Structures are given as structure tokens and as C-alpha cells.
């Protein structure tokens, strides 16, 4: 059975690139346009095995989303990848603002997404 990845990003084009890339590689993909929608999906689904989330989104940003995910008993230990620009990533790392399992920098490169995801969650 394919493993399921939740992709949370307000950019429809970024979700499309990541979603298509992962589907071609054999993953199930569920998409959300912001952190609140992502939480709503998680509350109704117990089978998501990896979360990829953007940092900057309306309604609920990526940092708040991650904090809320870590409060959910079923998802406390679920791996999370953060989508950022290189500038955002370096600021977050310097400030110890977030703990993630991996970083995916924008602009999104499909080969990089596959490398990161298959390392964390082999198909």
C-alpha cells in the first residue's frame, strides 16, 4: 500500500509540483492550502506518514502548524519537512525557531523532493 504524504502550501503551483512528483514516485498525496486546513485533514486521517509544509502561509503559518501537529497524539513523531527559501531557512536555524526532519528549499526541484522524501520515507 502506498505511503501517504500531506503537502501544506498556499501556492497551488508548489502543491502541484510536489504532488505530481510524489505520485509518480508511488506515494499517495493529500494537499492543504494552509495550516488550518492541514490540521483539519490530520484530525480526520490516521494514516499520514510524512508532512511537508510551507513556512509562510495565510490563516496559520508553518511554525504554528508544526507546533499544533506536535500536540496531536497520532502525529507527535511524524516526520516533517519545511519548505522555505534559503534566507528563511538560515534565519530559522540560527534562531533555533523550528525543529524539522528536513528542509526543502524554494524554488522546488522535483529531484531534490524525491531525494529528501525517499530518505525519510522509502516508498
Give the location of each predicted region.
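His-Asp phosphorelay/catalytic-motif detector in bacterial-type signaling
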Residues: 47-49, 74-79
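Active-site residues of response regulator receiver
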Residues: 54, 84
Amino acid at each position: 500500500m502506498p505511503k501517504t504524504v500531506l503537502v501544506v502550501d498556499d501556492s497551488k503551483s508548489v502543491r502541484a509540483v510536489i504532488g505530481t512528483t510524489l505520485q509518480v514516485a508511488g506515494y499517495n498525496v493529500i494537499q492543504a492550502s494552509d495550516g488550518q486546513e492541514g490540521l483539519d485533514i490530520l484530525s480526520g486521517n490516521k494514516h499520514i506518514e510524512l508532512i511537508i509544509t510551507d513556512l509562510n502561509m495565510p490563516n496559520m503559518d508553518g511554525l504554528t502548524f508544526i507546533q499544533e501537529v506536535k500536540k496531536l497524539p497520532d502525529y507527535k513523531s511524524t516526520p516533517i519537512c519545511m519548505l522555505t527559501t534559503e534566507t528563511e531557512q538560515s534565519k530559522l536555524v540560527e534562531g533555533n525557531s523550528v525543529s524539522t526532519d528536513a528542509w526543502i528549499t524554494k524554488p522546488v526541484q522535483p529531484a531534490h523532493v524525491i531525494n529528501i522524501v525517499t530518505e525519510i520515507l522509502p516508498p
